[in-house]
Amino acid sequence: MEEEEPEIRELQRPGKGTNTRIPGHDRTHICQAIAELRGALGEESISTDDEDLQSHGYSEWSSINSERLPVAVAYPKTTEEVSRIAKVCSKYRMPMVPYSGGSSLEGNFSAPHGGMCIDFVFMDKILALHDEDMDVVVQPAVQWMHLNDQIKHAGLFFPVDPGPSAKIGGMVGTCCSGTNAVKYGTMKNWVINLTVVLADGRIIKTRRRPRKTSAGYNLTGLFVGAEGTLGIVTEITLQLAVIPEVTTVGVVSFPSIRHAASAAMQAIRMSLPVQAMEIMDEVQMGVINRAGGTGKTWKEVPTLFFKFAGTKAGVKESISLAQSIAKANSGENFQFSKGEQEMHALWSARKEALWSMVSLRKGAEQIWSTDVAVPISRLADIIGMHILQP
C-alpha cells in the first residue's frame, strides 16, 4: 500500500495573494521531507494545519510581515531532534526558521521563502541552576519572567527585560534589550555559551562555562543577534545578577519633550545610577489613559520613568540627584513608589504602552511599531519629527 502524501495547501497571508510555495523548490521534495520527518519524529511532530501555519508566519501586532508562510511546523523535544530536522531540510534544500515566543514586532520569525518553521514550545525547561557560579542553563522556550520566578529563591535574577511574553531563544536571536539596558546592557552581555545546530545538522557548543576564556574565536557573540541565520540555538547558558536590596520607581512630568530629553541627557552625563530610564511623550500618555489598563489617570505631558535599584542608602541618594536634575529642567509632580505594589503600578504605564495602542485600534487599523536609534543628543529631534509627521 502506498504511503499517503502529506497535504500541502496553497495558503495566503491575510490580505495578500501570494502563496507559500518556495521559489525553485519542488513540491515533491517538500512532501518527501515532511513524510521523512514524520517517520523519524512521529506524526504529531510535524503540522501542516492552516491555523498553525498562519500563527507561525504572521503577527497582527507587527508592521513587518512576509508575504509567505511556512509550509510546515516542526515541534522538536530535544537537540538531537532539531539536528534530525536540519539534516532532512538540508537534504531537500528547505529553509528553516526557528520560533520560540512569537512576540517579535520586527518580523523576526517570518518565512519569506516558506520552508520549515521549528517551534520550541516543548523545549521549555530550566536544565541547571549553578547559584554559586551565578549562571543557569535553559532551553529556548523558557520565558524570561518565568525564569526569574524560578530562581529568585537563590537571590538571583536575569536582568534583560523585553516584552513580557518574550522567550530566551528569541531574545538570543535578536540580541534583545529592555528597559534595564541602561544599567545591565543587552542580551550579548549575559550569554555565556550556546548549543547550536548548524544548517547541515551538526551540533556545536560555542564555548565552556567559565567566564574568562581566550581559547578560540568568540563564537557565542557570532550567534547572538544572528536571528537564526547561522544556526539554530537549542540550549543557552546565561549569566545571572544578584537581586538588588531595594528597587523603586520614580515618575516625573515635563512641559515639553525637549525638557524631558534634556533631563535624560544630564542624568546620563552625571552617571545617575539608575536601573532603567524611559521617556514617553504626551501622545503615549494619552493612549494609556484611554486604554485604562494601569488603574491610574496620568497627566498627558512628556514623562520620564526612572527605576532605581541598589542599597537603601544608594537608592535614596539616586532619588535625590534625579529630583535635582528634573527640577533644573522644569520637571514637576515627581512621584516615587513606597512599596512593591506601588512600584509595579507606576512602571506599568511603560510596560502597557504597546498593548494600550493595540486595544484602541479601530476596524482594520494597523499598529506600526519599530525601534530607532540615534545619539542621545538627537533624542528630542527624533521624537519631534514623529510628532510633526504623524
Predicted segments, located by residue:
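FAD-binding subdomain of flavoenzyme oxidoreductases
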Residues: K125-E278
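N-terminal flexible segment immediately upstream of the FAD-binding catalytic core
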Residues: M1-K87, K91, S104-M134, Q284-G293, ...
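Glycine-rich, histidine-containing beta strand-loop boundary motifs that form or position
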Residues: P98-G102, F109, F120, P140, ...
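Generic structural signal for well-ordered, non-membrane alpha-helical segments
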Residues: D26-I34, Y75, T79-V82, P140-L147, ...
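C-terminal substrate-recognition/cap domain of FAD-linked oxidoreductases
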Residues: E3-I8, S47-G57, V242, T248, ...
